[in-house]
Swiss-Prot record:
This is Macrophomene synthase. Signal peptide: none annotated. InterPro entries: Isoprenoid_synthase_dom_sf, Polyprenyl_synt, Polyprenyl_synt_CS. The keyword DNA damage does not apply. Its cofactor is Mg(2+). A motif (NSE/DTE) lies at residues 242-250. Keywords: Isoprene biosynthesis, Lyase, Magnesium, Metal-binding, Multifunctional enzyme, Repeat, Transferase. A motif (DDXXD 2) lies at residues 456-460. Residues 368-387 are annotated as: Disordered. GO terms for molecular function: lyase activity; metal ion binding; prenyltransferase activity.
Length: 698
């Protein structure tokens, strides 16, 4: 098989002349070692096993140690089987240097899947989205969040990023898209309806990107869509195989869970919707799987000469994955040990009849748009019909919050890095707050942050926020200001639910600092008064760092642990890093330009670090000051004015100076984090990952 460089070089080719994939890292299994149980009967489905299976087992051992330390002991078997480790069978051509990482990844996922399956179906349905957020460091607010699981997911993501950032990015993007399409478990009317659901639920698309990671194939989410039909058929074949072998276990869990509405398993769905016996349903599953197994091979033959070489290698790997998953599922301890406990062929299936069609709701009260109910009107409506003037009868409609909430919901719907939420999750790995307290603090921080963004965009006359029109452009300044005030009431309301009597004092202290910091930022801009770098850092510590100080102090106050560690260094360095990195991105990042506009800070007249440095060191100070004066007169800068300002900054070395400061702060944040990790005796993978996603390369 070609190496990674070969894949990526040949990816641009449109005419395929290379021979079929040459296996380098695996050997075919002897037929005496496995039983296909009626699946994958085409001889091209020949299972293989990685030569370095011991590396996958070493990865599993690491994962088991980590998960037991951070999550707890869970005895159910995971990756092993009588034939081999799941990674060795499902990804037989994984690059040797990545086998151990893949083993650790898969073992961890199985471990957490065990926990999910032991909970309610509602909890299970939430975990896919939460894990995606944990890998992306996006916002999570679930009160059922498992702090240890978050640390594990962050550690896995960090490991993938350290090995191959590009392929890891493909995995994370696929995971995020998968989570966005995740649906809650439900009853199904037909096997067709079920398998479409199961294709998404199984996360097959993520598995394919993990396989590509293992093989060193840089295939983006968009590129893989070129062969989406084949991937979907493979995913459905994998799902039918898994359902066949996992049914007994899943049926047992179904009986035990009080909120179960059905089993997300093809055997159950066929038995329920088509009236088949268990044996008949299992045979039907084999037939359905065969249709998709055959389709994979047929479509693969049709497209091989039309796709890039790396996609061709991916399709070969997909065939190995389908048959490897089969052999593993048929022999793994995870399912086979359970089947040995069930000697009978037929299990009593708890079937509740066909799904009940939804009925029209019956209302006994009038329902307002906000969801609140009013008693049905009586003969006396509270209105004097003689003059048409309403009286105060007490029956007036209760107005809802849909208007005041509209700007808030709009802004919160836009993409966000979720950095502050990730910091809360990471800190909780050390502070061990109750889940309820974590949820409240996240809400308080979210409300304050959203309020500050709404207000900032108005004060800065910013037309864009995260690539979309700012809220005040859509809803108007007056309405957006009112929504900002409303958010402060929501924040205080949630704050009152915290148990610590210190919470209100902490809130007042830090919010006061934030407002003072903002006042200087606004004053410098309005008065065309350039601060010193030291004054600018003090403003950042109050304005940007204030929210970080707030969340840390609230968490310490709510923590059941006695905490005497000093977080001030980490918090201050993080606030400065976050803001000055933003200063640099505003003037140099194409992504930032797409989200906020070209050099938006210059339009707003903000004294960011590059501008402050330039005004002190440029030979063209009068020219730069004149540009700022004209900006104030005109309400912004033209493209040509911005280009001139950037040129002056470059000549003064201001952009390079700012980049140097960002890199120094980046190192400082990691040093402060390392101090706390040593003090607590525990690495904080969640915060490490959050910082890694912001990293600027030296």
């Amino acid at each position: 098989m070609c190496n990674t460089k070969c894949y990526n070089t040949l990816a641009k080719m449109t005419v395929i002349t290379e021979p079929a994939m040459e296996y380098m890292y695996s050997v075919p299994l002897d037929e005496s070692e496995y039983d296909k149980c009626g699946f994958c009967q085409d001889p091209r489905y020949r299972p293989r096993r990685h030569k370095d299976q011991h590396l996958a087992r070493a990865g599993s051992a690491k994962a088991k140690e980590l998960c037991e330390a951070l999550i707890g002991v869970y005895p159910r078997p995971t990756c092993e089987s009588a034939v081999g480790h799941s990674i060795a069978l499902v990804m037989p051509e994984c690059m040797p240097g990545r086998v151990e990482a893949m083993g650790e990844f898969m073992e961890s996922i199985f471990y957490m899947d065990n926990i999910a399956e032991s909970g309610s179906q509602q909890d299970t349905g939430n975990l896919g989205t939460e894990w995606a957020n944990d890998m992306e460091t996006g916002p999570t607010t679930s009160v059922n969040s498992n702090t240890g699981a978050k640390q594990v997911m962050a550690k896995l993501a960090l490991q993938l990023l350290s090995i191959d950032p590009v392929c890891a990015g493909n995995v994370m993007k696929a995971w995020k898209e998968w989570a966005a399409g995740f649906a809650k478990p439900r009853r199904f009317d037909s096997i067709e309806q079920y398998i479409d659901y199961r294709l998404v639920d199984s996360g097959a698309i993520v598995a394919v990107h993990l396989m590509n990671f293992g093989m060193g194939l840089d295939i983006s989410v968009e590129e893989l869509r070129e062969v989406s039909d084949i991937v979907n058929h493979a995913g459905k074949a994998l799902s039918y195989q898994n359902d066949f072998f996992s049914f007994n276990y899943e049926h047992d869990m179904f009986v035990k869970l009080p909120d179960s509405i059905g089993i997300a398993n093809a055997v159950f769905v066929l038995a329920e919707t088509e009236g088949l016996s268990l044996a008949e349903a299992k045979e039907r599953v084999k037939e359905l799987a065969k249709e998709h197994e055959d389709a994979v091979l047929r479509l693969k033959d049709e497209v091989e000469s039309k796709v890039s070489y790396k996609l061709r290698i991916c399709l070969e790997g997909l065939v190995d994955m389908v048959v490897g998953n089969l052999v593993w599922s048929a022999s793994c301890d995870r399912y086979s040990s359970y089947r040995r406990e069930k000697h009978q062929m037929e299990l009593p299936i708890r079937i509740q009849g066909p799904p009940t069609p939804p009925q029209e709701p019956v209302y006994e009260k009038a329902t307002l748009p906000n969801g609140k109910q009013l008693d049905a009107p009586t003969e006396s409506s509270g209105k004097d019909l003689s003059d048409g003037v309403a009286t105060l009868s007490g029956d007036e409609p209760v107005l809802g919050d849909e208007i005041v909430s509209a700007p808030i919901k709009y802004l919160e719907s836009l993409p966000s890095k979720g950095f502050r939420e990730a910091i809360i999750d990471g800190m909780n790995g050390w502070l061990n707050l109750p889940a309820r307290s974590v949820s409240i603090i996240k809400d308080v921080v979210k409300h304050i942050h959203t309020a500050s963004l709404l207000c900032d965009d108005i004060e800065d006359s910013s037309p864009l926020r995260r690539g979309q029109p700012s809220a005040h452009i859509i809803f108007g300044v007056s309405q957006t200001v009112n929504s900002t005030s409303y958010l402060w009431t929501l924040a205080i309301d949630r704050l009152s639910e915290l148990s610590s009597p210190k919470s209100l004092r902490i809130f007042i202290d830090e919010v006061r600092k934030m407002q003072i910091g903002q006042s200087f930022d606004l004053h410098w801009t309005a008065a065309l008064q350039c601060p010193s770098e030291e004054e600018y850092l003090s403003m950042i510590d109050m304005k940007t760092g204030g929210l970080f100080h707030l969340l840390i102090r609230l968490m310490i106050a709510e923590s059941p642990r006695k905490v005497d560690m000093d977080f001030s260094g980490l918090v201050s360095m993080t606030g400065r890093y976050f803001q000055i990195r933003d200063d640099l991105s505003n003037l140099t990042s194409e992504e930032y330009e797409n989200q906020k506009g070209y050099c938006e800070d210059l339009d707003e007249g903000k004294y960011s670090l590059p501008l402050i440095h330039a005004l002190k060191h440029t030979k063209n100070k009068v020219q730069l000051e004149s540009l700022l004066i004209q900006r104030k007169t005109q309400g912004g800068m033209t493209l040509e004015m911005k280009r001139l300002a950037i040129q002056i900054m470059k000549e003064a070395g201001s952009l390079e100076h700012t980049r140097k400061v960002v890199l120094e702060l980046q190192d400082a944040v990691h040093r402060e984090l390392a101090k706390l990790e040593e003090a607590f005796g525990q690495e904080n993978y969640v915060i490490q990952l959050a910082l890694e996603r912001l990293r600027i390369k030296a």
